[in-house]
Amino acid sequence: MAENTLRPLTADEQRFIEQHVLFGVRERGIDPENPAAMDAEFSQALAAVVQGAAPQGIAQNVVGVAGAMLGHHLCIRHGLVWAMDGAQDRNRWVILSQEKNAVFYPFDAAAKHWREQETDWMPGFAAMVAHAVEDEGAPADPAAPSAQGSAES
């Protein structure tokens, strides 16, 4: 990911994040400071879909709320900022350190874990981000797999 593909969020993109975070807090009762609580809600929705108790169409909403809430939590907790990565001719939501040395993809992570029907991943993702930000030693391409996973896992 080349740094020149990053840009600040537009007002509409910022509103999208805010609306998804507010939905999670107000409508679902999710604690925005607790990745385990976010993960529990994600896991419950995934289980309902797998068991046929919820329509598959809820995936986009669940992934949107999960990505927005996790990214919001990490921005507040670690001083990260939202941006848009326009690499590969598509826009991807990212959170990055002020120095832009550490870039993470919370929406991509939520989508990946939804597709793979994986739960119990948000606390680990949050811990990985915390460690990388503390060290500012994130890999050059955080989407690339590493021995400990990627910034999408």
Where are these regions (language model features)?
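Compositionally biased, low-complexity repeat tracts
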Residues: V25, A53, V63-G67, C75, ...
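Amphipathic protein-protein interaction modules
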Residues: Q60-H113
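A sequence-level detector of short, solvent-exposed, charge-rich linear segments
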Residues: P32-A40, N61, V65, D89-W93, ...
